[in-house]
Amino acid sequence: MNLHTPKWAIKTIVPEEVYTDRQYFLDSFYEAALKARTRRTMSTVLLGQRRMGKTEIFKRVVNRLFFEQDHRDPDAVVPIYYSFPENVTDKWHFATKYVENFMRWYAAFRLRDTQLLSAETYERHKLIELISNHRGLSETFKTTPNLLKTILEQDVTLPEERAVWLPRRISDYDDSTIVVFLDEFQNTRLPQYHFDVVGYMQEAVESPTCPHFVTGSAMSILAREILGRGSLFGRFDSEPIEALTGYFGTELTSKVAKYYQVTLTEEIAPVVAERCGGNPFYITAIIRQAAKQKQALIDESTLNAMLAVDLSSGFIWNELSDQVNRWIERINDYGITKWILYLSALEEGDEIDIKRIQQQLKERDGQEVSIETIKEVLIKLSRGDLIDYKSFGGWFGKINDPILVDFLKVWGKIEVERQDRGMVRDDLRQEYTNLKLKISDLKGYLAEIYMAQILLNAQRQSLPGKYFHQENDIQVPYFTYVRLRERLGPGKDSEMDVHGGAGAEQWVAESKWRAGRKAGPKEIKILLDKAEIVRKDRNADIVRVWFFGHEGFTVEAKTLMKEQGVFWSTREDLDGLLDHVKLRRLPKL
């Protein structure tokens, strides 16, 4: 190998010092790729909202497959990576690019030479000559230059079909194993360019010798239109990826702050993660903005200030405005798409009132627009994950992304209402500066995040009873969900710090972290009342009640908890649990 050849086949973006909590997906796709040698791996989609780290996962798995196998082993799994572009000149250009990309990846792996992946370093004619003459490549693979030549000469029927079938043809004929990683898979169908290869993909993805792992940035198009119907329906297993949990969002926040040398208090880190909805991109953007402004993040007020700046003119603004404007350009049939998207974001509730939007269009823009036209535009917006469309119920709602919704309000004032950009940004900073603090007990909230992650890590396992002051070990169920700060009724005492739902078994947990103050019987009784609310609301057979008191408990509280079967943990107990499930201990504040 050339000494200057990098130790990666495809460059990743996130620094190792920062990368957080995607190990499950890295291992899952790596192991599934290796398992393809046994012909037991199904084509799989990694499905999730934008900016959740899907592309990074694919790149890291590809690099691992590239370097951690013996490339000379005929049973080695050959990784191929391709990202579908947003615009396609014609079918000939696509077929040429797809076939050449496959040739480069296959040859680069088999010869362990990453320089073959670069068209700038290794020109096409040199690649063709190498493949045609190298003794270390299979005779079947050596025929690929012939296909490339016929495509370049436009002397082949259905070039796009021949292109996407090529990896399977090689693996089937050689009885070898190839795994194809396809990013931006929603771009297999681009109506505005009269480009659609979805139908041809069916034959390609069904081969046990050549499973395809796909992902993309438009979740709705992928799930509903490309994989959820038509020729590819039922051909893919699904691996959903969600936002980071509170614990790992907190960990990422701390890592990014250290990387960018931003002062960050332990207490505010989980609040940054929560306000960003656990989205890695948003978290990183806020920390980078703080670094740019030389602003320490020490409380909610400083966090709000950074959110206001970044939403209106920073990294988040640049990313989301590009995303929104590109999608609107793609679908703008009526000249009213921007207005409808903006007015949808202004709706007070989560559900969008179409009649109100119709009325607002008339009042604000003087346009008479039918309900059917508005629905049609909303459906198109939902395809770009800008609106949530419940097709079975026939109603629309805001997307579950509070940062995006807040951005759309600012974007609409500037881009749609044409208000003064500087004034809008200044108003947003004022609004965010005056926001009421959402979390009064920052230390208690931090502990809740750790408690929730303990439950998630311990699913289907037992935890030592001693850490709950119980004689027997505690069996933890598989949870449908574990939520923080969930409210199941009116009044302040109906909010659960931690609520885990596991069908007939429910968990309710409380956290108290107040310096010099032990938890007493009153707090225990309030928690027991909350548990009863959960029992009735969820019709539960079993409700596990768990109380964390950082400063400990009064004698009376311990007596009551023993009588009522309440699990309880001190700081030392919680640290013991964190050690047991291999998480870092609570920070010392």
PLM region spans:
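Short, amphipathic alpha-helical interaction segments positioned at domain boundaries
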Residues: 319-320, 402-435
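Catalytic cores of nucleic-acid endonucleases
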Residues: 491-493, 501-507, 511-573, 577-578
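Sensor-1/coupling segment of RecA-like P-loop NTPase cores
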Residues: 172-182, 187-193, 200-229, 241
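Winged-helix-like regulatory helical subdomains adjacent to P-loop NTPase cores
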Residues: 284-371
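Walker A/P-loop-proximal flanking segment of P-loop NTPase domains
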Residues: 1-72
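P-loop NTPase nucleotide-binding core
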Residues: 42-43, 48-182, 188, 194, ...
